[in-house]
UniProtKB/Swiss-Prot annotation:
Assigned EC number: 4.2.3.2
A cellular-component GO term for this protein: membrane
Name of the protein in its database record: Ethanolamine-phosphate phospho-lyase
Alphabetized UniProt keyword annotations: Lyase, Mitochondrion, Pyridoxal phosphate
Organism: Homo sapiens (Human)
CDD domains hit by this protein: OAT_like
Top EC category: lyase
Regions annotated as coiled coil: none
One Pfam assignment: Aminotran_3
Chain residue ranges for the region called Disordered: 468-499
Amino acid sequence: MCELYSKRDTLGLRKKHIGPSCKVFFASDPIKIVRAQRQYMFDENGEQYLDCINNVAHVGHCHPGVVKAALKQMELLNTNSRFLHDNIVEYAKRLSATLPEKLSVCYFTNSGSEANDLALRLARQFRGHQDVITLDHAYHGHLSSLIEISPYKFQKGKDVKKEFVHVAPTPDTYRGKYREDHADSASAYADEVKKIIEDAHNSGRKIAAFIAESMQSCGGQIIPPAGYFQKVAEYVHGAGGVFIADEVQVGFGRVGKHFWSFQMYGEDFVPDIVTMGKPMGNGHPVACVVTTKEIAEAFSSSGMEYFNTYGGNPVSCAVGLAVLDIIENEDLQGNAKRVGNYLTELLKKQKAKHTLIGDIRGIGLFIGIDLVKDHLKRTPATAEAQHIIYKMKEKRVLLSADGPHRNVLKIKPPMCFTEEDAKFMVDQLDRILTVLEEAMGTKTESVTSENTPCKTKMLKEAHIELLRDSTTDSKENPSRKRNGMCTDTHSLLSKRLKT
């Protein structure tokens, strides 16, 4: 493949012309990706990387069915949605068929951020209320209206929480306020929302909506306890608000057993508004808000027309329809269940073996590995997590870390991920954890390595990295980027680009 620029020149041009707040993976040595296919990505040297984090290329990178559908429609027509066209109504019909009956009205947008912004508008118009309840560590998009309700973002900056925003504790039963040993963590976390509603009402405020990802992604791959959402919905509805389920990162069969993540909590839980995005177009910008007729009619009654220039255009809908076809025809939802179960079992064995692994949580191909320094205190192993993802990159496996402490390895690969891919990923992780734990002086079970000299070399390198970091001159800039371990998680690691 002919490239316009060398990697060095590409980096230079990026620094010159792209805003510095636009980050890339692996800051100290970014990968230049030139092509991709299925669950694999290739750099400018032809090196193949196993993609374990790209939940945008849902049915696989550059799937020929998606490419063909886009090309065919682009050759015929692509215009705005003010004209009648079959694609938009067919796509709306197909999407609605995957959802509970009451969710039947669609608004197409171009991104998850646009979808969540519109969801807030729908919720506020419905009853005329303004306040929003969100979860701690939540992220719902990059628009100003969404940064305001995303503690993941506004708590990191200088922004002050707006008075109409109320933050409820994340229903995290591993690291949160109410843990796995609590008698009824679902009720306890839901009661926190109930108290927020009561306090808001006592202050003369009214709740428009509660918004949450069906499984919190950026917050650390958190799966709420069973019954939590039902109780929250009851309290929110009682306050005249609506429940918004953000499925932007977790929908379209990723959990395996169900097409939508919110469905795994039971048939007695149905959100009032569902937003979706990322995987819808397999990389093509398409997103959607689906809601009830009642909420849609209230929005229309405002007299303000809703129009989105590109939302629901013929090409985007053709791509979206192709993605739905591929999920069904290739049984990718079933694959997510089978491979996800297999991967989870492999990781549970690693948890029993490695002291750094505190928790394995997930369902289908949505999995988090919570790394800790101390199992009793559950101290986040932030530096170790960053070290691991860089070492995995050297092994040609792409992982990333997230959560409030950046210590949770997140796994959200394309849905065509195989058992062979899962085993390869876990084998590399096992070797890296073994070397790292030995370098740290923590106990790990004995591991038979296929390449003892290589293991010895890695162990020496890990020792050197740890030594170098612990003896860094205090006068040096502690936030400089480095391709390895660090001792100051609030300086170096916080400066590292989000991966």
